[in-house]
Structure formats: C-alpha cells, structure tokens
C-alpha cells in the first residue's frame, strides 16, 4: 500500500471481509505515520485483478484460501509475500500454479501505537521471479513496470527458489 498508493492509473485495494473490512473502511491502515484508505473489496468484487499480493500471518492462510480462489481470474498474477517457503504451494491447491509469481519480501518493520513503521531506505524489498525460463517473462516485466518509481525496492531473479530458501 505504501509504495503503490501514489501510482497513477491503477486501482489499489485490499481484499477483506467481516470486521477487518469494516475496520479498514472506517480507519484505513497506517504505515510510517501516514493513514492510507485503499478500496476495500470482497473477494468477488476483486475478481480478476491484475495483481493480488497475499500478505497475511502464516496461520491465517488456510482460512483465506477460498477468498484467494474467488479473487483470482485467468490472468491474475499472485505474489505471496509471506514468511515460510510453502505458501505458494498452499495457494496452488485452490488456483492454477501458472498464476503464481514466486516472491518474498525482506523488510524490518515494527508496530507502533498508530500502525506499522519501516525504513524504506534500508529495506531490501521484494524479490520475485519465474521458476522456469523464460525468466524475463512478460509477467516479470509488468511487475517491474508497476513497481518502478514507487520507492519500493525490488528486483527479479532467475533463482527465486534459492532466494526463498535462503531467506
């Protein structure tokens, strides 16, 4: 949300239901002392988004799989920026593996009274890539284009599996 909130010509939102959706609609989310109010969509409203970033506590993933399935369209790219190395495998039980862009995030964040904080300059950022050639795929280029000029640190790699295992 932090880096993408200023990107023109995109519709940025989060998928949430129940109390979480209500809280996000009313209070937004605070990152680095700035309150963001992204769109809040149900999985059905989000259906077919170009990019779905899964960013949950690991224990919440099993309960979110149905929502992920409902949001992913034929051409949706799914990036799972969660701890652990098997979230993509879990997600691929409900969507085609071809929709998944293997990825990880390296960020040192901490909770403060009003939200979460991190130092954008010292953050390694998002690392992503295709499991198999072609590694410079259209999907990789689309993500690079989206993240360019956002302040988000990112890079793609031909060795995403090894990067994930070494995190």
Please give the residue ranges for each predicted region:
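Short, charged/polar "capping" segments at the starts of alpha-helices
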Residues: 20-25, 88-89, 136
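Rossmann-like NAD(P)(H) cofactor-binding subdomain of soluble oxidoreductases
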Residues: 33-117
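Internal alpha-helical scaffold of NAD(P)-dependent oxidoreductase catalytic cores
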Residues: 41, 70-71, 94-99, 114-166
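NAD(P)+-binding Rossmann beta1-loop-alpha1 motif at the extreme N-terminus of oxidoreductases
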Residues: 1-37
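Residues at the C-termini of beta-strands that transition into short coil/loop
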Residues: 16-18, 42-44, 82, 104, ...
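A structural signal for isolated positions on well-ordered beta-strands in alpha/beta enzyme cores
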Residues: 11-13, 79, 101, 127, ...
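Flavin (primarily FAD) cofactor-binding/catalytic cores of flavoenzymes
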Residues: 14-16, 68, 139
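A short, glycine/Asx- and small/polar-enriched loop/turn
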Residues: 50, 166-167
């Amino acid at each position: 949300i932090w880096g993408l909130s200023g990107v023109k010509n995109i519709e940025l939102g989060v998928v949430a239901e129940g109390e979480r959706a209500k809280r996000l609609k009313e209070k937004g989310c605070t990152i680095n002392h700035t309150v963001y109010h992204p769109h809040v969509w149900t999985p059905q409203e989000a259906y077919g988004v170009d990019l779905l970033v899964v960013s949950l506590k690991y224990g919440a993933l099993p309960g979110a799989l149905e929502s992920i399935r409902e949001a992913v369209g034929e051409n949706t790219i799914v990036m799972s920026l969660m701890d652990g190395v098997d979230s993509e495998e879990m997600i691929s039980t409900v969507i085609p593996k071809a929709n998944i862009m293997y990825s990880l995030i390296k960020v040192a964040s901490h909770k403060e009274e009003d939200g979460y904080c991190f130092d954008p300059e010292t953050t390694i950022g998002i690392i992503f890539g295709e499991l198999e050639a072609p590694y410079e795929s259209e999907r990789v280029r689309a993500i690079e284009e989206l993240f360019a000029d956002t302040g988000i640190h990112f890079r793609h790699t031909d060795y995403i599996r090894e990067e994930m295992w070494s995190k």
